[in-house]
């Protein structure tokens, strides 16, 4: 029996996050677009308000918590793949590292890359929490 590691994340303190970094909110990987830190009072601990946008769904999410609280950060694996076929709303890719076949829905393709998808082209793919996103055509 082969066990597969599904969630590839690590934990960091909320105060260490910066704009442009990534965080998992409600099970969805998100890119931090705004972070605000404020000290509540003389005896209160500092709080962080994090605004992030979902990598896959584009949804805006807000998270408020103490700066010393642990937050889940996704480990993003970046690799090159070759397009085997583009059929309807699914792109079939071949991972150039181990030559396995991957299917990526068209909704997980960056807008600027959509017009340049053609069989044989090489693309940069990000694997985040066991899902794939095509970032750009090389």
UniProtKB/Swiss-Prot annotation:
Gene3D superfamilies (UniProt xref): 2.30.30.30, Nucleic acid-binding proteins
GO molecular function: ribosome binding; RNA binding; translation elongation factor activity; translation initiation factor activity
Gene Ontology BP term (one): translational elongation
InterPro entries, per database record: IF5A-like, IF5A-like_N, NA-bd_OB-fold, Rib_uL2_dom2, Trans_elong_IF5A_hypusine_site, Transl_elong_IF5A_arc, Transl_elong_IF5A_C, Translation_prot_SH3-like_sf
SUPFAM superfamilies per record: Nucleic acid-binding proteins, Translation proteins SH3-like domain
Primary location: cytoplasm
Annotated transmembrane regions: none
Positions carrying Hypusine: 42
UniProt KW keywords: Cytoplasm, Hypusine, Initiation factor, Protein biosynthesis
Pfam families, per the entry: eIF-5a, IF5A-like_N
Localization terms from the record: Cytoplasm
Signal peptide boundaries: none
One Gene Ontology CC term in the entry: cytoplasm
PANTHER family: TRANSLATION INITIATION FACTOR 5A FAMILY MEMBER
HAMAP family associated with the record: eIF_5A
Family to which this protein belongs: Belongs to the eIF-5A family.
Function: Functions by promoting the formation of the first peptide bond.
Protein name (Swiss-Prot/TrEMBL): Translation initiation factor 5A
Organism expressing this protein natively: Pyrobaculum aerophilum (strain ATCC 51768 / DSM 7523 / JCM 9630 / CIP 104966 / NBRC 100827 / IM2)
Lineage: Archaea, Thermoproteota, Thermoprotei, Thermoproteales, Thermoproteaceae
């Amino acid at each position: 029996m082969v066990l597969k590691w599904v969630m590839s994340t690590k934990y960091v303190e909320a105060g260490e996050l910066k704009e442009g970094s990534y965080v998992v909110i409600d099970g969805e990987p998100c890119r931090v677009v705004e972070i605000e830190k404020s000290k509540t009072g003389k005896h209160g601990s500092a709080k962080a308000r994090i605004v992030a946008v979902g990598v896959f769904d584009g949804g805006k999410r807000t998270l408020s918590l103490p700066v010393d609280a642990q937050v889940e950060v996704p480990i993003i694996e970046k690799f090159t793949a070759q397009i085997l076929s583009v059929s309807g709303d699914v792109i079939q890719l071949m991972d150039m590292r181990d030559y396995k076949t991957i299917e990526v829905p068209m909704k997980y393709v960056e807008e600027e890359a959509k017009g340049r998808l053609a069989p044989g082209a090489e693309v940069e793919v990000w694997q985040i929490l066991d899902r794939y996103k095509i970032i750009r055509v090389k």
